[in-house]
Amino acid sequence: MKEEFYLAGKILKPKGLRGEVKIQPVTDFPDSYLERKIFYVGKSEEEAVRRTVRQAALRKGFAYLLFSGIDTREKAEEIVGFSVFVRSDALIQLPPDRAYLHELRGLKVLNERHEELGIIEDVLGMPAHDVYEIRAEGGLVYVPAVEEFVEEISIDEGYMVLKRFEEFL
């Protein structure tokens, strides 16, 4: 069975001479970089190699990691642009009112009367708040991911109820 991986960040550049790399986290929980001991690093999920974290730090919104087997600047330069993944079984347990992006993609979107309106294609990270990209009958519709418009989310049952959806058509 193929392991499932989820994107946790992108390697931006080496830092220093010992192989440390600067990473742009793609998570609402950057502190998890300080706690995790294992990441998978590669150009893609299929090419990802298991790496043990020897040292971790967070500074100004970036993670700085020193991986085993990457002990020179030259080796660090070889993985610049690579993605950093975590295995699905290593994801942090979220509180009931939170969900991972991969759990939201594909959810049915319903109105207050529970009539189907479309499917969530993606969740876009915007400066003010996330935005749901919904494939509806007339094309793509963008709805702010805020309480004012979200009545209910049921990951287990596979749907999201939106209020005032017609305002975005």
From Swiss-Prot:
Keywords, in A-Z order: Chaperone, Cytoplasm, Ribosome biogenesis, rRNA processing
Classification via InterPro entries: PRC_barrel-like_sf, PRC_RimM, RimM, RimM_N, RimM_N_sf, Transl_B-barrel_sf
GO MF term set: ribosome binding
Boundaries of every PRC barrel domain copy: 96-168
Compartments, record wording: Cytoplasm
Annotated Pfam families: PRC_RimM, RimM
A single Gene Ontology CC term: ribosome
Statement: the UniProt record of this protein carries the keyword Chaperone: yes
One example of a Gene Ontology biological process annotation: rRNA processing
Domain comment (free text): The PRC barrel domain binds ribosomal protein uS19.
Function text: An accessory protein needed during the final step in the assembly of 30S ribosomal subunit, possibly for assembly of the head region. Essential for efficient processing of 16S rRNA. May be needed both before and after RbfA during the maturation of 16S rRNA. It has affinity for free ribosomal 30S subunits but not for 70S ribosomes.
Protein family (similarity comment): Belongs to the RimM family.
Quaternary assembly: Binds ribosomal protein uS19.
Protein name per the record: Ribosome maturation factor RimM
Species this protein is from: Chlorobium phaeobacteroides (strain BS1)
